[in-house]
Amino acid sequence: SVLCGLASTVPGGSNNRATGVGSFAAGFAAEANFDGCFVWGDFSTDSPVRCNLANRFVVRSVGGIYMLTSGNQESNYAGTFIAPGAQAWTATSDRNSKERLQPIDAEDVLRKVVQLPIATWNWKSQDPAIRHMGPMAQDFSAAFQLGETPKGISTIDADGVALAAIQG
């Protein structure tokens, strides 16, 4: 393993390189060649996994990626994962991980969705040419009282509201 960048870290593993300033490389054949890179390489291949632009978070994990926020993979847990070979996150939604199930009034949900302001917008931190569409979190929270914060919309809540509105 090679450690060359100022304030860079290679905590262990094998065949790792952290040459960017403030970079991190761990696992196997991880190369953090640009400033601010974090790279984790699994042991699935001898080929390196590289960070090719500054300030990126790069992980090679052909066995999948699991982010658990409670429990463990063998029992009731909360979290998200990307299955091996998959392209998208899957949120835990197992009935056995839930409690206090309550029925909803799909027609009421539909009425609220129809009244929910929807706009196109861009993030202040993005190029203005990149557009998105959706409700503002504060409006969504006021209408449905779902999730952890009135400043965010969980995709699992947005999906549930959309499916309920379709049923309505």
Located regions from the model:
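Periodic small-residue-enriched repeat registers in elongated scaffold domains
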Residues: 1-77, 81
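C-terminal intramolecular chaperone/autoprocessing and neck/assembly modules of extracellular spikes
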Residues: 55-56, 61-159, 163
